[in-house]
């Protein structure tokens, strides 16, 4: 981050907070509670589909085993384009705002923002209603997944995956296991720490490290201590970079000894990079969900509905979840 890139105190946005070291184990037993907190077009042209998503968020085709996109194409004959277009929510919003704000279409038929950004897009009138009649497999969702508080009718969004934010680290660089958010401020790792530009993730962890409860924040003044600690770490050279989803390369290479990271990303990286670890800090971590929505004016809303229905089939959801290592919203697929 350059000096001109000041820490964004208005960006506490992506996650919900998960307190306590027992939360990681408990989370798999309380998935409905996690996911419930998260809560068109002309309908024609169902011969093609364009989905923009986050990196490391779908299973690819490997050898004779078809990935989700190729299975969908084979099952439906719909031509599908899938791209990894996100690095962080604010960056993606800045990308789509000029067109949607001018009443113009953007290219993708489906996007997968985190729930807070989806709520913002809905409030701005930039989303199409879903044709739920064409998504009968939505009945397979974990109870409470439809009708989140920001989409009370449940007509504009459906869940993609959920996960956790904690500390990712490269044990070959740290030389020890990490347990606390305070480890990010250890002088031994000066210049080798990564922080997420998603400030709710980063500041949430630091607040819990300071003994504060982020869920009770009423104003940014309540988080001032955490921002001050982060800004001091930046000015002291403790922080190497503020990143979005691209933290993974620096983590694997050892440019980062440790960073704020997302659970499924790290679990995937471990397949080829066993030196990479993930831990929910003893002070607490955060939990979140990303959702599928259809941007205003999308051409292929029927194909979008067909995709959503496909990924909510339990067999399809299981294969997807087994690869991405995030929490599936489909009942029985955890």
What are these model-predicted stretches?
Residues 36-37:
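C-terminal motif of bacterial Sec signal peptides marking the signal peptidase cleavage site
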Residues 173-179, 211-217, 298-304:
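Short helix-loop capping/hinge motifs at secondary-structure junctions, enriched
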Residues 45-115:
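Early extracytoplasmic/lumenal segment of secretory-pathway proteins
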Residues 286, 290, 295-334:
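Mature extracytoplasmic/periplasmic domains
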Residues 1-12, 26-33:
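N-terminal secretory signal peptides
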Residues 119, 194-198, 202, 206, ...:
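Ligand-binding pocket segment of bilobal, Venus flytrap-like solute-binding proteins
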Residues 128-138, 157, 185, 274-286, ...:
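Short beta-strand->loop
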Residues 104-113, 128-167, 192:
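A structural signal for short loop-to-beta-strand junctions that line the ligand-binding cleft
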